[in-house]
Amino acid sequence: MKLPTLGKCVVRTLMGAVALGAISVNAQTLSSNSTGTNNGFYYTFWKDSGDASMTLLSGGRYQSSWGNSTNNWVGGKGWNPGNNSRVISYSGSYGVDSSQNSYLALYGWTRSPLIEYYVIESYGSYNPASCSGGTDYGSFQSDGATYNVRRCQRVNQPSIDGTQTFYQYFSVRNPKKGFGNISGTITFANHVNFWASKGLNLGNHNYQVLATEGYQSRGSSDITVSEGTSGGGTSSVGGASSSVNSSTGGGSSGGITVRARGANGSEHINLRVGGAVVANWTLGTSFQNYLYSGNASGDIQVQFDNDASGRDVVVDYIIVNGETRQAEDMEHNSAVYANGRCGGGSYSENMHCNGEIGFGYTYDCFSGNCSGGNGGSNSSAGNSSSGNTGGGGSNCSGYVGITFDDGPNSNTATLVNLLRQNNLTPVTWFNQGNNVASNAHLMSQQLSVGEVHNHSYTHPHMTSWTYQQVYDELNRTNQAIQNAGAPKPTLFRPPYGELNSTIQQAAQALGLRVVTWDVDSQDWNGASAAAIANAANQLQNGQVILMHDGSYTNTNSAIAQIATNLRAKGLCPGRIDPNTGRAVAPSSSGGSSSVALSSSSRSSSSAGGNTGGNCQCNWWGTFYPLCQTQTSGWGWENSRSCISTSTCNSQGTGGGGVVCN
């Protein structure tokens, strides 16, 4: 793979560059690493070897050239600091071809969080959207093109703050600009807004430049950059072209309209918001608008649940916040039959199998033109009067993922008690299968304060493993967790955060969403309790922190301060949505009476399964059938997981309980 670290080396110019003396107003050619200002613009130039050079010209213009003797180089002109709202215009020539490994991009850094970002306008032989181990976040339209968004993680790599672990955000233009004479406009706010809608937040800006970059290649550029005017309006989900039918019965703030039809007229769908079924309908054979008029908040899914011979569902779109979201623009579709299996495709309006299409969050605004609220503060779904103690309080302005790896073990009971005492629930446990097998009796304690998911069986390095080896390791862990009485995991955190396409494919085949972290507490590296609490204090809405359940006693000592700091910021613990990997609100807080379900959804047999009569268990925002024969813990009845009444009602603050119609 080429170019996975391009841009990293720019950082070294900030740490050890040879500073220029007084900058001349005349053209000046740089052949040594340097940063500074020139004719009112910030510039950066770095190379690790070879003949690459950059010439500073008037205003925002620079020229560059490099040959195959240069391993890696990058340079450009722009601003320091950058900002979220700048509109960047550029023009000139980009002298590479499709065989050369190079980018032309808006490039920059932020702190708190530490983020390296790219808006790729053109590239050669390597498409950065294929970076190994990354996560795709869909696409949007800006400045006359579609941009595909991907996030990658860099582990212990150079940054503007030394060697760090951080995320890269990529927006990659499609179609790319090409080569030769080139010009364009980047309305950066559109990228910032779309990233933020997916939980990809920027921090405080450092530099921001229109950069040329090359890796083991040859080429040249002559680029002039300036601040311009927007050429492409607000961002929107790519491809959303259908208009809203004038007969729609909804779409205003606080309601959701689903436009759908069935193949034979007996298909049944549920509307799920924040993990709960809020409405359900039996479809006709022609498109109709189905209206939910409540105000539930959270992630939105349309679920098909009675697949049989001759039954298929077509979902045209939904309307929320006055915005139309086309089904074919949504990445998550576990019901489409493609590539020889159910759930084998994306971006389709068809539902051939039982499953769901994910439509984002109620507070998202993909088009930038919404009539309802789309701020993070609207993500709270609770009707509880319990304040902000626990994961669903009415004072929550956002939700974060509190996660612990490597359990269960001798520390688990102590940690569970601390979490309860400080109302820091729900949490997400990423368990090792071998520890589960040895300590199955601790599973119920973990489940009493959150959810349990997959962290491999033996915590190995797996990047050199075959697909089958990875699959077996993860599947063995799933079985251990289920044998101990927990539901089948839907999330997987790779050991050491190491990820490649093989690991990703094996996880997907097992129905596991790969989840890493936004903030590393460094508890595994000997961080003090104060340092761990300070790390947690960096969390923003939707983000996830890495901590550990084990011999790291400083983690236990930090729990009280973490809880205090989060409450002061209006942030509450949440669950991690398996569709997005983001922390979201539990759909309930403070007991079963706070669960907001419509009467039609409560009576639906599909909502709670065939066990437990007309009752079901709200387990930290996810609904499971009640066991009929098992009296305690989790069970397996009628070919699916179930939960006993006593265990369901044992959840702590922020949990749910038994819900009956």
Swiss-Prot record:
Region (Disordered): 220-259, 578-610
Database matches in CDD domains: CE4_SlAXE_like
Induction (free text): Induced when the bacterium is cultured on xylan or beta-glucan but not on medium containing mannan. Is repressed by glucose. Transcription of xyn11A occurs in early exponential phase, and thus earlier than transcription of xyn11B.
SUPFAM superfamilies for this protein: Concanavalin A-like lectins/glucanases, Glycoside hydrolase/deacetylase, Type X cellulose binding domain, CBDX
Pfam hit, one: CBM_10
Domain spans labelled NodB homology: 398-574
UniProt entry keywords in alphabetical sequence: Carbohydrate metabolism, Glycosidase, Hydrolase, Multifunctional enzyme, Polysaccharide degradation, Secreted, Signal, Xylan degradation
Residue ranges constituting the GH11 domain according to the UniProt record: 29-226
Pathway: Glycan degradation; xylan degradation
Sample GO molecular function, one term: acetylxylan esterase activity
Catalytic activity, EC: 3.2.1.8, 3.1.1.72
Low complexity bias: start-end ranges: 237-247, 581-608
Catalytic activity: Endohydrolysis of (1->4)-beta-D-xylosidic linkages in xylans; Deacetylation of xylans and xylo-oligosaccharides
GO cellular component: extracellular region
Protein localization: Secreted
Signal peptide: 1-27
PROSITE patterns membership: CBM10, GH11_1, GH11_3, NODB
Ranges of residues in domain CBM10: 616-645
GO biological process: xylan catabolic process
Region (Polysaccharide deacetylase): 394-577
InterPro entries to which the protein is assigned, alphabetical: CBM10, CBM10/Dockerin_dom, CBM10_sf, CBM60_xylan-bd, ConA-like_dom_sf, GH11/12, GH11_AS_1, GH11_dom
Active-site feature positions: 116 (nucleophile), 213 (proton donor)
Stated role: Endo-acting xylanase which specifically cleaves internal linkages on the xylan backbone, releasing xylooligosaccharides. Is able to hydrolyze oat spelt xylan and the arabinoxylans from wheat and rye, releasing xylobiose as the major product. Also likely catalyzes, via its C-terminal domain, the removal of acetyl groups from acetylated xylan. Thus, has the capability of hydrolyzing acetylated xylan. Does not attack mannan, galactan, arabinan or any cellulosic substrates.
Family: In the N-terminal section; belongs to the glycosyl hydrolase 11 (cellulase G) family.
UniProt note: domains: The N-terminal domain possesses xylanase activity, the central region likely has xylan deacetylase activity, and the small C-terminal domain is involved in carbohydrate-binding.
Protein name: Bifunctional xylanase/xylan deacetylase
